[in-house]
């Protein structure tokens, strides 16, 4: 059952990376909330 472990590790790594990028980028999108103009 090594394939299952490897798949789980791969999915976990991709998930963490995707989560990090997803949480890192959005803050730049909601600019209208600041209303600096």
From Swiss-Prot:
Superkingdom of this protein's organism: Eukaryota
GO process annotations (BP): photosynthesis
Protein's cellular compartments: Plastid, Chloroplast thylakoid membrane
Record keywords, A-Z: Chloroplast, Membrane, Photosynthesis, Photosystem II, Plastid, Thylakoid, Transmembrane, Transmembrane helix
Listed GO CC annotations: chloroplast thylakoid membrane; photosystem II reaction center
Transmembrane regions listed in the UniProt entry: 3-23
Stored InterPro entries: PSII_PsbT, PSII_PsbT_sf
Main localization category: plastid
Topology in the lipid bilayer: Single-pass membrane protein
Family: Belongs to the PsbT family.
Self-association and partners: PSII is composed of 1 copy each of membrane proteins PsbA, PsbB, PsbC, PsbD, PsbE, PsbF, PsbH, PsbI, PsbJ, PsbK, PsbL, PsbM, PsbT, PsbY, PsbZ, Psb30/Ycf12, at least 3 peripheral proteins of the oxygen-evolving complex and a large number of cofactors. It forms dimeric complexes.
Role noted for this protein: Found at the monomer-monomer interface of the photosystem II (PS II) dimer, plays a role in assembly and dimerization of PSII. PSII is a light-driven water plastoquinone oxidoreductase, using light energy to abstract electrons from H(2)O, generating a proton gradient subsequently used for ATP formation.
UniProt name for this protein: Photosystem II reaction center protein T
Organism (species): Cucumis sativus (Cucumber)
């Amino acid at each position: 059952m090594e394939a299952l472990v490897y798949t789980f590790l791969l999915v976990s790594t991709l998930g963490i990376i995707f989560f990090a990028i997803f949480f890192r980028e959005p803050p730049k999108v909601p600019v209208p909330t600041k209303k600096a103009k």
